[in-house]
């Protein structure tokens, strides 16, 4: 770009040169669910002269270069990996707690080993028929008087 142009004019030239490509990229990326921030970052990253921020004219000491953007992207990738690791650890903890909760719930459904009816001896069942036999039941048809 011509350095004799003001930064507004440089921006205008840059935007006019890239408008067609940006529109095509957006039309291609929007159906894929790519956010506008990510599209803007990609456009900014591949801009050969660095990003031009609208708030103030670019300063040589603070100009964003592809190398700086690459370093920032590497930092963001490391942060993303850290967040993924933390998320997987949290997910494992939640799954463990869920499994423990299910075990506790299943344990409440189980019959304890010392339950009285599990410890009765067969001899205690032999008295039941005698008790039942002492009672008289009439299973026949009801008698009419």
From Swiss-Prot:
Transmembrane segments: 38-54
Taxonomic superkingdom: Eukaryota
Its membrane topology: Single-pass membrane protein
InterPro entries, alphabetized: CCDC159/163
Keyword tags: Membrane, Transmembrane, Transmembrane helix
Subcellular location: Membrane
Signal peptide residues on this chain, from the entry's feature table: none
Main location: membrane
One cellular component term from this protein's GO annotations in UniProt: membrane
PANTHER family for this protein: COILED-COIL DOMAIN CONTAINING 163, TRANSMEMBRANE PROTEIN CCDC163
Record protein name field: Transmembrane protein CCDC163
Native species: Homo sapiens
